[in-house]
Design a protein with these regions (language model features):
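Alpha-solenoid helical repeat scaffolds
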Residues: 11-14, 60, 125, 159
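Residue-level detector of the short coil/turn that links helix A to helix B
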Residues: 3-4, 50, 115, 149
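Conserved structural position within tetratricopeptide repeats
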Residues: 15-18, 64, 128-129, 162-163
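Short coil turns that delineate tetratricopeptide repeat
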Residues: 20-21, 67-68, 98, 132, ...
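Start-of-helix register in tetratricopeptide repeats
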Residues: 25, 37, 102, 136, ...
Length: 169
């Protein structure tokens, strides 16, 4: 799903470059999107193989202490709106970004699988705001409740995660 949206973005940028090969905004956005796509492909591959530490590492970006892939996508969106590549009529484009939601899912799941609930919760909360029925959000919240000793609430959340998971199967 995320790659379909990204492919649409690449198609739009390629059309922009075709119309004006010297358009610096389109050139820069195209290079950034290719770099982001490469990092996301790595993260998806690690996720498919349940290599959760590697998922987080791939999403952190190439430079230590530099912007994460998530930060880079947010910046690309802001730049695209301010430069007119994306129409200003789109309300809160970052909130509608399939790529950002995919990254939130990857971070949430990777941290939950590593039992790093404190690191998972900010990502799972962002994801839950967009997709409140996401199974990984329920699992994260269940783990958080377990850690706080709220066992009945944890069981309820784990049951909801199971229901969502079964409905997707």
């Amino acid at each position: 799903r995320g790659s379909q949206v990204q492919d649409a973005g690449l198609t739009h940028l390629k059309a922009c470059l075709h119309e004006d090969p010297e358009n610096k905004l389109c050139i820069r956005a195209h290079k950034q999107l290719r770099k982001i796509d490469k990092a996301l492909q790595k993260a998806r591959g690690f996720s498919d193989n349940s290599k959760w530490t590697a998922v987080v590492s791939a999403l952190k970006g190439a430079k230590v202490g530099g912007p994460t892939i998530y930060d880079e996508i947010q910046q690309v969106i802001l730049d695209a709106v301010s430069s007119g590549i994306l129409p200003k009529t789109i309300k809160n484009p970052a909130d509608q970004s399939e790529l950002l939601h995919e990254i939130e899912t990857l971070y949430c799941r990777a941290y939950v699988e590593q039992e790093m609930i404190n690191k998972a919760m900010p990502w799972c909360d962002k994801l839950g705001a967009v997709d409140p029925r996401n199974e990984h959000v329920f699992v994260a919240k269940g783990e958080e409740q377990m850690n706080q000793g709220n066992y009945e609430e944890a069981v309820r959340l784990f049951s909801q995660a199971s229901e969502v998971s079964q409905s997707l199967s």
